[in-house]
Swiss-Prot record:
InterPro entries: EIF3B, eIF3B_RRM, Nucleotide-bd_a/b_plait_sf, RBD_domain_sf, RRM_dom, TIF_beta_prop-like, WD40/YVTN_repeat-like_dom_sf. This is Eukaryotic translation initiation factor 3 subunit B. It comes from the Eukaryota. Residues 1-10 have a biased composition (Basic and acidic residues). WD repeats lie at residues 164-205, 295-335, 338-373, 444-486. The lineage of its organism: Eukaryota, Metazoa, Ecdysozoa, Arthropoda, Hexapoda. It comes from Bombyx mori (Silk moth). GO terms for biological process: formation of cytoplasmic translation initiation complex; regulation of translational initiation. The keyword RNA-binding applies.
């Protein structure tokens, strides 16, 4: 071992010549006299920032106020309830229930989670949640107390944030050829595909595996795509379908949008938030939760909240009340619900802030249908109905007409549990919304009603009626100043559903179900049957927004065989068949209403012949281009096949010595074509015997 200079001087020792050659003098590592030492904090600042820091653990602790004050005998039950609610957000490693001198809990508790993320999630999910009618949780992080106590007395304005450029949300409307888009869901994973219905072949725009856990839906105007996840709902938008917004609502399974896409409602049948946040209304632009509601005491139909046409109001039914809320405050209109004893159902007009509701019979008081204006709560029209078992409200898409289907009875038998009706017959009460004093016409049908549908643009409606063995389809015309007239009646038809084109005039008659599949494409101008077709076991039909195409599909959720979808023209010509294993859903992307006035639309239709030559020329160019592309594609495929075949033939020839060696040098390559050396052996065996008696 080498020694320092000082040691060598103090303890000189004889050294041999070899030692002098093997050991060199050790260099001097002492700092110079003018050396200034640089502190580690300055020299290694970037490295020290990454050094793990000791945590005091307060970030993991939450304070829950608003708990019940209980004695020792009920403390265990309280702990069980608290753990059931708060353990859903993470592992609770410690809990503390302070008590008073009398042994009662103080009403606030401390819970410690295993990490800060779980604590923050618990605060976000449970703050202001109701435990029961008397107790509401007020939940904060323990560190919040220090944060709020350190707020400076003098306010400092926040620094302006840089503007974040959003992608174009209406990009899909800018396509020069006005191609529509559609969504395809595959499997239970669920993989999603977004296609553009281009010519000659649809174009795949986006495909992602496991994009949603259950299913996906478009918003009403087509701006957003909503997907479902365990922790909530995500909205996607823009050309690349990037995430636009996400809403925390564990195990949400249902969603509905307001008509103008300002708000959305989610429902979780078995959510993680307890019983007070089953329904949550969120602001789509900001992602904020605007209001939440507990579940109702009895069964309700989805959607429970129904919106007015301009997003100003939304309403729901309660026990003998109709609760109307207004935005953006989300409070009750005039701070109180409307008392309507016996109310059963309601529906908003698609074009006005008017809602229709019906009230059931009560002893000698007849049933009643009422039209109510909001927000002034004025009854603009009502009609009494007698011997009513049920009613269904059907608005025409333009809001020009309202139809109330009334199920009436001749006899009724009331048991302790159930009510049985007999001698049923049916009325269709037609309200003329655009006429003075809103006159009402009535159409009576004695046979059972299978389906009803308004023409979206026009004044016709269609009805499927009769027993399953003798189905008839009737078309009526609504007239001003007189009762609706029967235009056409088709008898003995095997259909159970009606699907009008969004642009009116054309309708598809369909038989949905595992044993169905029949289709009929009908022009209601002269009731010409344009085509008769079938799609066996089809489970759904959907028109595209323009009324040019219609899709039929067999979902794997209903049937495991022959899953896929067909695309038809509005005349019933099959354009494309797509068989896809695991096919689950198909939805056309909606379009917003046109910006053109009715006058401008009529002018375009009037001068449509001027544009025919342009359209035909463009179609010919597209067809020619498509043909060239198809020929080039097939030529390339044939070239690849020829190259592959030649390579395999060469490989087969190179393996011939090995084949001869394995077959004792007997050439068997040409046995199939050698008729001289080939022996054909026929073997017959008894299968079964049948005896037929001939008279």
């Amino acid at each position: 071992m080498a020694k320092k200079k000082g040691d060598e001087k103090a303890n000189p020792a004889p050294q041999s010549d070899n030692e002098e050659q093997n050991f060199e003098e050790e260099p001097d590592f002492d700092d110079p006299e003018d050396f200034v030492e640089i502190p580690e904090e300055e020299l290694l600042a970037d490295i020290l920032e990454q050094k793990p820091k000791e945590s005091d653990g307060y970030e993991n602790v939450v304070v829950v106020d608003g708990c019940p004050q209980v004695g020792p005998e009920r403390l265990e039950k309280l702990q069980s309830v608290i753990n059931k609610i708060f353990s859903k957000f993470g592992k609770i490693v410690n809990e503390y229930y302070p008590t008073t001198e009398n042994g009662l809990t103080t009403g606030y508790i401390f819970l410690e989670y295993s990490n800060p993320q779980n604590a923050a999630e618990a605060v976000k999910a449970t703050n202001n949640c109701k435990l029961d009618k008397q107790h509401t949780f007020l939940v904060n992080l323990f560190t919040d107390f220090q944060k709020y106590s350190d707020i400076p007395k003098e306010w400092e304005p926040p620094a302006p944030q840089p503007f974040k450029v959003q992608s174009d949300l209406q990009w899909y409307l800018m396509d020069p050829d006005a191609y529509d888009q559609f969504l395809v869901g595959i499997g239970t994973g669920v993989a999603l595909q977004v296609w553009q219905n281009a010519l000659p072949e649809p174009l795949l725009l986006q495909e992602r595996p496991n994009w949603t856990e259950t299913y996906a839906v478009w918003s009403p105007l087509g701006t957003y795509l909503a997907t479902f996840h365990w922790r909530g709902v995500a909205l996607w938008a823009g050309p690349k379908f990037s995430q636009f917004q996400k809403f925390f609502h564990p195990e949400a399974r249902f969603i509905s949008f307001s008509p103008c896409e300002n708000y959305m409602v989610t429902f979780s049948p078995s959510g993680d938030r307890g019983d007070d946040k089953k329904w949550i209304i969120g602001d789509i632009r900001t992602g904020q939760e605007k209001r939440s509601f507990p579940p109702p005491d009895e069964y309700v139909t989805w959607p429970i909240f129904r919106w007015s046409k301009d997003d100003r109001f939304f309403a729901r039914i309660g026990a003998d009340v109709l609760s109307v809320y207004e935005t953006p405050g989300f409070g009750l209109l005039d701070k109180k619900s409307i008392k309507i004893p016996g109310i059963r159902d309601f529906s908003w007009s698609p074009s006005d802030n008017t809602l229709a509701y019906w009230v059931a019979e009560d002893k000698d008081v007849p049933a009643r249908v009422t039209l109510l204006e909001i927000p002034n709560r004025t009854e603009v029209r009502s009609k009494n109905l007698f011997s009513v078992a049920d009613c269904k409200i059907h608005w025409q898409k333009s809001g020009d007409y309202l139809c109330v289907k009334v199920d009436r009875y001749s006899k009724v038998k009331k048991d302790k549990i159930d009510i049985k009706y007999s001698g049923m017959y049916y009325n269709f009460e037609i309200f003329h919304m655009r006429e003075k004093e809103i006159p009402v016409d009535s159409v009576e049908i004695k046979e059972p009603i299978q389906a009803f549908a308004w023409e979206p643009v026009g004044s016709k409606f269609s009805i499927i009626h009769g027993d399953p063995a003798n189905i008839s389809i009737s078309f009526y015309q609504v007239n001003t100043g007189q009762a609706p007239t029967l235009l056409k009646k088709f008898e003995r038809k095997p259909f159970n559903h009606l699907f009008w084109s969004p642009s009116g005039q054309f309708i598809v008659l369909a038989n949905l179900g595992l044993t169905g599949g029949a289709l009929e494409f009908l022009d209601t101008n002269d009731f010409t049957i344009m085509n008769v077709a079938d799609h066996y076991q089809m489970s759904g039909i959907e028109w595209d927004p323009t009324g040019r195409y219609v899709v039929t599909g067999v979902s794997s959720l209903k049937c495991k065989m022959d899953c896929g979808y067909y695309i038809w023209s509005f005349q019933g010509k099959i354009l494309r068949r797509v068989m896809k294993e695991g096919f689950a859903q198909f939805h056309w992307r909606p379009r917003p209403p046109t910006l053109l006035s009715e006058k401008q639309q009529k002018e375009i239709k009037k001068n449509l012949k001027k544009y025919y030559s342009q359209f035909e020329s463009k179609d010919r160019m597209r067809s020619s281009k498509a043909s060239k592309e198809l020929v080039a594609k097939r030529t390339e495929q044939m070239k690849k096949f020829t190259e592959y075949r030649e390579s395999k033939i060469q490989e087969w020839n190179e393996q011939k010595p090995r084949r001869l060696e394995l077959r004792d040098y007997v050439d068997t390559d040409g046995l199939d074509t050698d008729a001289v050396n080939t022996v054909e052996e026929v073997i017959e065996f008894f299968v079964k015997e049948e005896q037929t008696v001939i008279e």
